[in-house]
Amino acid sequence: MIQALLVAVGGAIGSLLRYYVGQWTLRLMGPAFPWGTLAVNVVGCFVIGVFAELIARRFNASVELRLLLITGFLGGFTTFSAFSLDAISLFERGEAVAGGIYTVASVGLSMAAVMAGLAVMRALA
């Protein structure tokens, strides 16, 4: 139960931060381009790289800290960071084909799923 709570707390903080970054970039740069989403995805990818190295590899941190920061906080801030870490991990393990398939499938299938969801709802309207 404590692990789920840590994920929830981290996720709430990450989600709030994502919201505030989105609002800030909207005020600063306007609505013509999704700057907020781009910002959280790039920053989240950098931060997950830092956390993965420090928490998991250098300090051998507890499962709870990983759940709070990586699964919770970064999961709430951006799921793109988790996707990117998974893809890089495949490439670093020498699994280039799997990494390429995972990357193309993740982006392609995600975009197809969004298009399908839009089409379903538009058809029902």
Swiss-Prot record:
This is Fluoride-specific ion channel FluC. GO terms for molecular function: fluoride channel activity; metal ion binding. It is a multi-pass membrane protein. One of its GO terms (cellular component) is plasma membrane. One of its GO terms (biological process) is cellular detoxification of fluoride. It catalyses: fluoride(in) = fluoride(out). Its main location: membrane. Na(+) binds at residues 75, 78. The gene is fluC. Keywords: Cell inner membrane, Cell membrane, Ion channel, Ion transport, Membrane, Metal-binding, Sodium, Transmembrane, Transmembrane helix, Transport. It holds the Pfam family CRCB. It is found in: Cell inner membrane. The chain crosses the membrane at residues 1-21, 32-52, 68-88, 101-121. Fluoride-specific ion channel. Important for reducing fluoride concentration in the cell, thus reducing its toxicity. Na(+) is not transported, but it plays an essential structural role and its presence is essential for fluoride channel function. Belongs to the fluoride channel Fluc/FEX (TC 1.A.43) family. InterPro entries: FluC.
